[in-house]
Swiss-Prot record:
GO terms for molecular function: metal ion binding; metalloendopeptidase activity; toxin activity. Zn(2+) binds at residues 333, 337, 343. This is Zinc metalloproteinase/disintegrin. The lineage of its organism: Eukaryota, Metazoa, Chordata, Craniata, Vertebrata. It is found in: Secreted.
Length: 483
């Protein structure tokens, strides 16, 4: 059984903010400097892992203290995850690396119900977190003999090319009229409880991208793993688990002709996937990561409603930004097309309740992380009308149960509440069980160990959305579209 170690990192902000610096993610004009200091809490029956199942970080953002809770994304890789590259003489070399003890995490900010986080802890902390509606990126500064990290906003990254970057999918390109008409209906709250679905994703890296990263396969692997971790986080609200099934790097040469005409390349890649890749490894959808510049400022393309189709369950994504978060948003967008989603602008005046969302035809600044109501409608209609079978089954992987750790703010196996302090009036710190008479110990719909009354406001509305309200049956504050 995998044991858990709870870790607290105190990040002290450096006395000054940097004005400009060159990072892996690009040139950044304004950033904060933080220094990790590791403080280890005593776990229960701890057996040291290289990467803990649950971690906690403290840092200051804009001078305010922030607590970041992280939990390992155990569904990131399939159990039979494989990596393939090619020798100089063209031989295919496939390995099945052990990825159970990996370094990719999801999480949230303490006391911020709308927060999210997607972090790699492989070599310092790298990724993003959303705090009070703002997206921040964090990455190591790579200074000698230093644990310094930079925290900054996406808008502070210098843009090399200000031309708008577009998705190549057009309104009626590979669309289905009956699907499109049905998707104009608003979903009822019951319909918006999306069923659990699983996508086993194959990612293929073309030879141009291999050369771009100086023939460094390890660097490409880390980049792809970070990318899929981010994609997985963005699809969680739709109850879709994205699992990386295989990674193939065309290290010797391209196995199709990669052309600047994106529609031609997509067709060739779809044919190759159907006739070659699917016969070697089972998976649900394949996307090609490429370094080529597509004509028309296009950075991505996919077949709409193509999921589970042998030829059409494919997409193209240009690795056009050094910031992996940006490329992850593009692939999230193209996967949305595979799942039946159209562009938000293509709704004939219908309000989508989102100014900048993932399915906007042009990538926004900063890149969007949310799906609009229109996208949710499209996805629901796709599930109803097409019922794609390949995404029904959960991917094979080792299901590990964490050993309970008090105070990590995640409920582990056998816990009814997160123990924390022995003085907690609702939760018994010795057993991690609720005290007699207690219904809950924490949560936005918990007050003095009892569930708040039904329809009590637990999260104030933002924009056009209604307030979120308690159900009276749980300590959780459900999104309005989950009620």
């Amino acid at each position: 059984m995998i044991q858990v170690l709870l870790v607290t990192i105190c990040l002290a902000v450096f006395p000054y903010q940097g004005s400009s610096i060159i990072l892996e993610s690009g040139n950044v004009n304004d950033y904060e400097v933080v220094y990790p200091r590791k403080v280890t809490a005593l776990p229960k029956r701890a057996v040291q892992q290289k990467y803990e199942d649950a971690m906690q970080y403290e840092l200051k953002v804009n001078g305010e203290p922030v607590v970041l809770h992280l939990e390992k994304n155990k569904g990131l890789f399939s159990e039979d995850y494989s990596e393939t590259h090619y020798s100089p003489d063209g031989r295919e070399i496939t390995t099945y690396p052990s990825v159970e003890d990996h370094c990719y995490y999801h999480g949230r900010i303490h006391n911020d119900a709308d927060s999210t986080a997607s972090i790699s802890a492989c070599d310092g902390l790298k990724g993003y977190f959303k705090l009070q509606g703002e997206t921040y990126l964090i990455e190591p500064l790579k200074l000698s003999d230093s644990e310094a990290h930079a925290v900054y906003k996406y808008e502070n990254i210098e843009k090399e090319d200000e031309a708008p970057k577009m998705c190549g999918v057009t309104q009626n390109w590979e669309s289905d009229e009956s699907i499109k008409k049905a998707s104009q209906l608003y979903l009822t709250p019951e319909q918006q409880r999306f069923p659990q679905r699983y996508i086993e994703l194959a990612i293929v890296v073309d030879h141009g991208m291999y050369k771009k990263y100086n023939h460094d396969s390890d660097k490409i692997k880390v980049r792809v793993h970070q990318m899929v971790n981010h994609i997985n986080e963005m699809y969680r609200p739709l109850n879709i688990a994205i699992t990386l099934s295989l990674l193939q790097i065309w290290s010797n040469k391209d196995l199709i002709t990669v052309k600047s005409a994106s529609n031609v390349t997509l067709n060739l890649f779809g044919n190759w996937r159907e006739t070659v890749l699917l016969k070697r490894r089972s998976h649900d959808c394949a996307h090609l990561l490429t370094d080529i510049n597509f004509t028309g400022n296009i950075i991505g393309l996919a077949y709409k409603q193509g999921m589970c189709n042998p030829k059409l369950s494919v997409g193209l994504v240009q690795d056009y930004s050094s910031n992996v978060f940006v490329v992850a948003v593009i692939m999230t967008h193209e996967l949305g097309h595979n799942l039946g989603m159209e562009h938000d602008e293509e709704k004939n005046g219908k309000k989508c309740n989102c100014k900048t969302c993932i399915m906007s035809p042009a990538i926004s600044d900063p890149p969007a992380q949310l799906f609009s109501d229109c996208s949710k409608n499209d996805y629901h209609t796709f599930l109803t009308n097409r019922n794609p079978q390949c995404i029904l089954n959960a991917p094979l992987r080792t299901d590990t149960v964490s050993t309970p750790v008090s105070g990590n703010e995640f409920l582990e196996a056998g816990e009814e509440c997160d123990c924390g302090s022995p003085s907690n009036p609702c939760c018994d710190a010795a057993t991690c069980k609720l005290r007699p008479g207690a219904q809950c110990a924490d949560g936005l719909c918990c007050d003095q160990c009892r569930f708040k009354k039904k329809r009590t406001i637990c999260r104030i509305a933002r924009g056009d959305f209604p307030d979120d309200r308690c159900t009276g049956l749980s300590n959780d504050c459900p999104r309005w579209n989950d009620l």
